[in-house]
């Protein structure tokens, strides 16, 4: 691989479009993107699959290729390394600029590997992003081979994080198979996301106020879980809060089960079809949580 990767140059080109008309692309070379995938994959594998992080940090939910909204999040929260970040997955698909989005996130991971963290979402999986837009974007702008390189990278992402032993973070939610944190630590990477079981549930399950215990999930994958499941899980592991993403919520964040769980969603005006706000959660060093909101853009005059 002849490309020497200049990470600072890559980041500065990705940030050059700040203030440009939303939708302007940044076309890195295919070799540079391959380099981002390979180097970040190395780093993911050198760090645990269950991250143990320290506050202060900012936690973000789904981005889904809404690159200009990702830039707005950083403008609001502080561009790395000004703030520490944990993203909860779903970087690609649905939005128009999955490539810029994932490239900036991987570049920051490489440059600030101890202060910038990315978890795996259910869309960081070949069978899903083959269908919902990322494959087509890779094929149109680069090559199918590059999409496969991303798959190899995504298969190595960590799947959960614990902040200061008190906040449990993952993309989707809990699993009926999850009884000890050691089970997460034992998941071997690289791995695809299976159709069922612990890893699938961490990336796919949803809280549901009408569910007692565990229920069927309308997604046709994984389960729903009720407030009592959340309470028992927190009590058993001495956690204070579950922080997850995976569902659009109107205000960008939404509590469940008497504030024992929070859903974060960071893509405002999701897909151009919703009027939702986007939010990120700021956790200070005393573990106090506050929310920074990206309001949805005003409906453009037709």
Curated annotation (Swiss-Prot):
How cofactor binds (record note)? Binds 2 manganese ions per subunit.
Q: What is its EC number?
A: 3.1.3.16
Q: Which terms in the Gene Ontology molecular function aspect does this entry carry?
A: metal ion binding; myosin phosphatase activity; protein serine/threonine phosphatase activity
Active site residues per record: 123 (proton donor)
Q: What class of enzyme is it?
A: hydrolase
Kindly indicate whether the keyword Cytoplasm belongs to this entry: yes
What residues bind Mn(2+) 2, as annotated?
A: 90, 122, 171, 246
Q: Give the protein's cofactors.
A: Mn(2+)
In which residues is Mn(2+) 1 bound?
62, 64, 90
A cellular component term, taken from the record's GO annotations: polytene chromosome
User: Is the keyword Metal-binding in the record?
Assistant: yes
SMART domains in UniProt: PP2Ac
Keywords attached to this Swiss-Prot or TrEMBL record, sorted alphabetically, are: Cytoplasm, Hydrolase, Manganese, Metal-binding, Protein phosphatase
Briefly, what is this protein's role? Answer: Is essential for the regulation of mitotic chromosomal segregation as well as regulation of chromatin condensation during interphase.
Q: How does it assemble?
A: Interacts with Nop17l. Interacts with uri; uri inhibits Pp1-87B phosphatase activity. Interacts with Rif1.
Family the entry assigns = Belongs to the PPP phosphatase family. PP-1 subfamily.
Query: What is the protein name given in its UniProt record?
Result: Serine/threonine-protein phosphatase alpha-2 isoform
Q: Which organism is it from?
A: Drosophila melanogaster (Fruit fly)
């Amino acid at each position: 691989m002849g490309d020497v990767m200049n990470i600072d140059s890559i980041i500065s080109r990705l940030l050059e479009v700040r203030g440009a008309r939303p939708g302007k692309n940044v076309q890195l070379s295919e070799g540079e993107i391959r380099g981002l995938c390979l180097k970040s994959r190395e780093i993911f594998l050198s760090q645990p699959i269950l991250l143990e992080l320290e506050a202060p940090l900012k936690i973000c939910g789904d981005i889904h290729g809404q690159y200009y909204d990702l830039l707005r999040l950083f403008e609001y929260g502080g561009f790395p390394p000004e703030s520490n970040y944990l993203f909860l997955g779903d970087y690609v698909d649905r939005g128009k600029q999955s490539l810029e989005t994932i490239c900036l996130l991987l570049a920051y991971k490489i440059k600030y590997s101890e202060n910038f963290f990315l978890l795996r979402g259910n869309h960081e999986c070949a069978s899903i992003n083959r269908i919902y837009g990322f494959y087509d974007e890779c094929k149109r702008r680069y090559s199918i081979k590059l999409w496969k390189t991303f798959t190899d990278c995504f298969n190595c992402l960590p799947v959960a994080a614990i902040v200061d032993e008190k906040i449990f973070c993952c993309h989707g939610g809990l699993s009926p198979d999850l009884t000890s944190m050691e089970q997460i630590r034992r998941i071997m990477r690289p791995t695809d996301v299976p159709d069922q079981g612990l890893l699938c549930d961490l990336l796919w399950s949803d809280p549901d106020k009408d569910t007692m215990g565990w229920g069927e999930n309308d997604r046709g994958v994984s389960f729903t879980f009720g407030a009592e499941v959340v309470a028992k899980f927190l009590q058993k592991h001495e956690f204070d809060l579950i922080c997850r993403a995976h569902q659009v919520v109107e205000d960008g964040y939404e509590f469940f089960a008497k504030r024992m769980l929070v859903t974060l969603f960071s893509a405002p005006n999701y897909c151009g079809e919703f009027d939702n706000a986007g939010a990120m959660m700021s956790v200070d060093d005393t573990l106090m949580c506050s929310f920074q909101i990206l309001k949805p853009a005003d409906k453009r005059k037709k």
